[in-house]
């Protein structure tokens, strides 16, 4: 991912977020006038996550800490589906904000932004069609 020249030498705070099969590497920079504020995989956040409501979930940690518009966010996300990627980005943003300012931890924890969702796909068991689906039972 190529960063704009203005951001390349800047100090940044990094946070890693994961959810299901998705992993996101988030970097937070001080906002620079005229630069994009929220990029995901070199695209604008609304272009990468076009579904209704995704943007509000993603900027939740920034809104709860009153930093929306005051920091620039760049994200590299891979793996999983749209929802998993969205939630991994949100967790990465929250973790990066804690590195940015430790005093934000309470507000982020209170709103559930620092909690990693532990649910992952259950493995397929032998003798079953899927993790829990059994083959059709036949009496004869």
Describe the predicted segments one by one.
Residues 2-20, 24, 28-29, 34-78, ...:
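Structured, basic alpha/beta domains of bacterial-type, RNA-associated proteins
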């Amino acid at each position: 991912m190529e960063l704009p020249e203005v951001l390349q030498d800047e100090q940044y705070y990094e946070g890693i977020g994961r959810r299901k099969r998705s992993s996101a590497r988030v970097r937070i920079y001080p906002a620079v006038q005229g630069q994009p504020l929220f990029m995901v995989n070199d695209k604008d956040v609304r272009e990468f996550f076009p579904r209704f409501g995704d943007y509000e979930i993603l900027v939740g940690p920034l809104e709860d800490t009153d930093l929306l518009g005051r920091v620039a966010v760049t994200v590299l996300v891979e793996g999983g589906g749209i929802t998993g990627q969205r939630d991994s980005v949100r967790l990465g943003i929250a973790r990066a904000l804690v590195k940015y300012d430790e005093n934000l931890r309470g507000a982020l924890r209170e709103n559930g932004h620092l909690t990693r969702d532990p649910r992952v796909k259950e493995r397929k068991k032998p003798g079953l069609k899927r993790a829990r689906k059994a083959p059709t039972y036949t009496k004869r």
